């Protein structure tokens, strides 16, 4: 399958590109002008440009012979209150709908558990959404808008891939584990945390890439979890990470309160 990937050079994108190439797919990886491709993109066709500012001519060139679009691009995903989420959401929508109008009939879009908002228990495709921060609000709007567009575009096969907490290659994922490694490098004795009692869904980046590949080549439309399906406490995840990496730093709990929009137990249903 010939697959266009936005955000191809990002933390998730580079692993997905590698997985798709290993499975024999042709990948068209979109990068910003002047961006240096990660080594995992070796073998992919590189397409340079800002997806929010592509001319019609460049869009036509992009979709030639392509069968599928995987939209991973998103700015400031780890800063849930960044103004870019709401400022850019219509640009994402306009890009995606323009791709469909140019003939791409299989579109998969990265979603997030933060669309759901405060919720306790397993999340599935029918879980009500009431997002509590700009990141979740923007992603939730994009999901609703895209499925509305799909409802009047019957030839479009739309898949919404809902991501959870991603681990692996932790030097580069900007997660709590990245911060633990940075604190270890700085020879800090303790790493401050909240209670650590919350249960989350942690999925390794390599497993996530496999799940994404399976979904984007399927013929199903709808909302799909890309997750482990297993709740694990933050405390357990942190202590396992420290032990596995032979770190000297120690977790210090109850330094920070939990975020107002974080539930005590939330994970993806599989």
Curated annotation (Swiss-Prot):
InterPro entries: Epimerase_deHydtase, NAD(P)-bd_dom_sf. Pathway: Bacterial outer membrane biogenesis; LPS O-antigen biosynthesis. The active site is at residue 135. The keyword NAD applies. Catalyzes the reduction of dTDP-6-deoxy-L-lyxo-4-hexulose to dTDP-6-deoxy-L-talose. Its EC number is 1.1.1.339. It catalyses: dTDP-6-deoxy-beta-L-talose + NAD(+) = dTDP-4-dehydro-beta-L-rhamnose + NADH + H(+). NAD(+) binds at residues 11-12, 50-51, 72-76, 87, 112, 135, 139. This is dTDP-6-deoxy-L-talose 4-dehydrogenase (NAD(+)). Substrate binds at residues 112, 135. Keywords: Lipopolysaccharide biosynthesis, NAD, Oxidoreductase. GO terms for biological process: O antigen biosynthetic process. Disulfide bonds: none annotated. GO terms for molecular function: oxidoreductase activity. SUPFAM superfamilies: NAD(P)-binding Rossmann-fold domains. The gene is tll. Belongs to the NAD(P)-dependent epimerase/dehydratase family. It comes from the Bacteria. Gene3D superfamilies: NAD(P)-binding Rossmann-like Domain.
